[in-house]
A protein has these predicted regions:
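Conserved catalytic cores of phosphodiester-cleaving nucleases, focusing on short active-site segments
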Residues: 35, 142-169, 182
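OB-fold/S1-family single-stranded nucleic acid-binding modules
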Residues: 85-97
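Short nucleic-acid-contacting surface segments enriched for D/E, G, S/T with interspersed K/R
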Residues: 63-76
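Low-acidity, Ser/Thr- and Arg-rich intrinsically disordered low-complexity segments
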Residues: 1-2, 13
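Short aromatic-glycine-enriched beta-strand elements
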Residues: 42-47
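Short, charged beta-turn/beta-strand-edge "cap" motif at the junction between a beta-strand
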Residues: 39, 79-84
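A short acidic/basic microdomain associated with nuclease active sites
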Residues: 120-137
């Protein structure tokens, strides 16, 4: 029995400042703020030019963000005025190569959860119980347990040829570990899935970037057998 691989495009539309997954609309709380990227540094920080000011925004993506970080790329920020927050702005989307790319990895699970709850993902239309952050073992958590289905979500932001999204954008030991653990779960009677959420505007094709992480690619092939 092979490990099912699911690829879901999350279409980003700025006509309404929303995330859109098929018929499902997931609105941002507030209108996004447009700016220009100056730089990203220390993984979690980005300097953004908004009008005539420079603001520091939280970068909620710890990956390499390969191909997205060119200076002066258009970006979209969300704003939170909670006084407890050190940074009021969060980097949500970057426009690169004329494509809008959702870079907030925290939103990936929210998009999938919304799709699960509303029955928009055909593989899981009949599920009854959705449990986020499923603890599979002492050192491994998966994103969702839906009845006996384990779902691990991977956020996809890499686009190198304008037609095909790719994962990963850097070597991912954690991703490889997840594949191996999902194979273990299969042997234990679970039905595990890898769900690649492609947050790139207008892209429906996907492949593994084997030139970036050959080990992940090899384990991906093992999982598919």
């Amino acid at each position: 029995t092979s490990l099912p691989i699911i690829i879901i495009p999350a279409i980003i539309s700025f006509l309404f400042d929303i995330y859109k997954y098929k018929l499902n609309i997931m609105k941002f709380t507030n209108t996004l703020i447009k700016g220009k990227l100056i730089k990203r540094y220390k993984r979690f920080f980005t300097d953004i030019k908004v009008n005539n000011s420079i603001v520091t925004a939280h970068c909620p993506n710890t990956g390499s963000m390969k191909g997205l970080l060119d200076k002066d790329n258009t970006v979209f920020l969300s704003k939170n005025d909670d006084p407890k927050r050190k940074l009021k702005f969060t980097l949500e989307i970057i426009e690169a190569n004329k494509k809008l790319v959702g870079v907030n990895t925290h939103r990936a699970n929210k998009i999938v959860a919304d799709g699960l709850n509303k029955g928009l993902i055909k593989e899981f239309k009949s599920i009854k119980n959705i449990k986020p952050e499923f603890k599979f073992s002492s050192d491994t958590r998966f994103d969702f347990l839906c009845d006996k289905n384990i779902i691990e979500v991977k956020n996809v932001t890499l686009l190198r040829d304008q037609k095909v999204a790719e994962f990963p954008d850097a070597v991912t030991e954690r991703g490889t570990k997840h594949l191996k653990k999902l194979i273990e779960a299969l042997k234990q009677g679970y039905k595990p899935f890898v769900l690649f959420l492609t947050q790139i505007q207008g892209i429906n094709n996907f492949k593994i970037a084997k030139d970036i992480d050959l080990n992940y690619y090899k384990n991906y092939l093992i999982a598919k057998k």
